[in-house]
């Protein structure tokens, strides 16, 4: 802490990202990256963009990518917002739409960036407890609020809220913005983007870091009513008019166009997830139902922190949270078959 820091900065509690180890020999199953590489079409598009044009600023509106997203989801271009990763998109949403008089609602076990944004932007909030099965209770959100946000599937649990339940939340709060954070939706869920034309208070966010294997590019998006998108554009252009670089724009657009590769790799992750679940259950683990590219598991006879340490000694990194209610769980990303086997072998006999 420095004497030059403002009182505001001194009171911030920043987000702690997952470990990015420098050792390349480790089996990295802690940050939910896709084990399969980006679309070859995306790589080719970025390679073609490595030319003299890099001396020029990128399109501030990222229209090429915006139209690719709009075409993919069957919406209009003015219903799409783009940012430098979904975290930046979420930051603009908190800043531009969720600073209200009434408290923002989100699950008590959820994406840990939400309370960080609330602290950054001075947003009053309430953490709504999940039920004993770590599911969202829809009725708990049917009360006065200044907005609602939740991941679907939830993170770090991986549990999915059905689309009709999402719609119940929307109907119960027609005067509040409801944000559905769909970072992992492509691994087993149905996107709420199909509802945006019926609910002007709905905003759906997604990322290209997970199902499209572009975590290194930092591309995120939101889809919603044009009025909501306009608010985000106003915030963006008061902060950074050029959030996406030229390589990110063309690479992400090509990734959306390569539907065959996308479908194939998503299915590979889903199939691998079911294999890992079966292997862990055979070792006595309790595994929550997952619609994501990770699983959330605990062993009734073994401490989670101890298991994480044991795996690390075997060269396998998983994520352990010390948060109340989930301190005995491990979040395990789905890797390649070789990585998944290393996980199971690393656990040994329990």
UniProtKB/Swiss-Prot annotation:
It comes from the Bacteria. Its EC number is 2.6.1.9. Its cofactor is pyridoxal 5'-phosphate. The keyword Translocase does not apply. The keyword Electron transport does not apply. One of its GO terms (molecular function) is pyridoxal phosphate binding. PROSITE patterns: AA_TRANSFER_CLASS_2. The modification N6-(pyridoxal phosphate)lysine is found at residue 210. It catalyses: L-histidinol phosphate + 2-oxoglutarate = 3-(imidazol-4-yl)-2-oxopropyl phosphate + L-glutamate. GO terms for biological process: L-histidine biosynthetic process. Belongs to the class-II pyridoxal-phosphate-dependent aminotransferase family. Histidinol-phosphate aminotransferase subfamily. Homodimer. This is Histidinol-phosphate aminotransferase 1. It comes from Pseudomonas fluorescens (strain ATCC BAA-477 / NRRL B-23932 / Pf-5).
């Amino acid at each position: 802490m420095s004497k030059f820091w403002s009182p505001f900065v001194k009171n911030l509690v920043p987000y702690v990202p997952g470990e990015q180890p420098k050792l390349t020999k480790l089996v990295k199953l802690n940050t939910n990256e896709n084990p399969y590489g980006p679309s070859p079409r995306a790589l080719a598009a970025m390679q073609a963009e490595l030319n003299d044009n890099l001396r020029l600023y990128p399109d501030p509106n990222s229209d090429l990518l915006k139209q690719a997203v709009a075409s993919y989801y069957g919406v209009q271009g003015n219903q799409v917002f783009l940012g430098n990763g979904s975290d930046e998109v979420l930051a603009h949403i908190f800043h531009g739409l969720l600073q209200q008089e009434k408290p923002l609602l989100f699950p008590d076990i959820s994406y840990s960036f939400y309370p960080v944004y609330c602290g950054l932007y001075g947003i009053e909030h309430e953490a709504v407890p999940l039920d004993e099965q770590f599911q969202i209770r829809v009725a708990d959100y049917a009360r006065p609020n200044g907005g609602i946000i939740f991941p679907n599937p939830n993170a770090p649990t991986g549990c999915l809220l059905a689309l009709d339940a999402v719609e119940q939340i929307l109907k119960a709060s027609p005067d509040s913005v409801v944000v559905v954070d769909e970072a992992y939706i492509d691994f087993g869920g149905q996107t709420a983007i199909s509802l945006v034309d019926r609910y002007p208070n709905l905003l759906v966010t997604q990322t290209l870091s997970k199902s499209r294997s572009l975590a290194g590019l930092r591309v995120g998006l939101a889809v919603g009513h044009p009025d909501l998108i306009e608010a985000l554009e106003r915030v963006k252009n008061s902060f950074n008019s050029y959030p996406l670089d030229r390589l990110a724009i063309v690479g992400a657009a090509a990734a959306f166009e390569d539907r065959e590769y996308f479908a194939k790799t998503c299915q590979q992750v889903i199939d691998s997830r079911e294999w890992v679940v079966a292997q862990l259950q055979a070792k006595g683990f309790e595994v929550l139902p997952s619609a994501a590219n990770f699983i959330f598991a605990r062993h009734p006879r073994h401490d989670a922190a101890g298991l994480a340490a044991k795996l690390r000694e075997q060269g396998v990194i998983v994520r352990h949270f010390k948060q109340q209610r989930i301190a005995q769980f491990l979040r395990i990303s789905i890797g390649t078959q070789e990585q998944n086997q290393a996980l199971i072998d690393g656990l040994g006999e329990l």
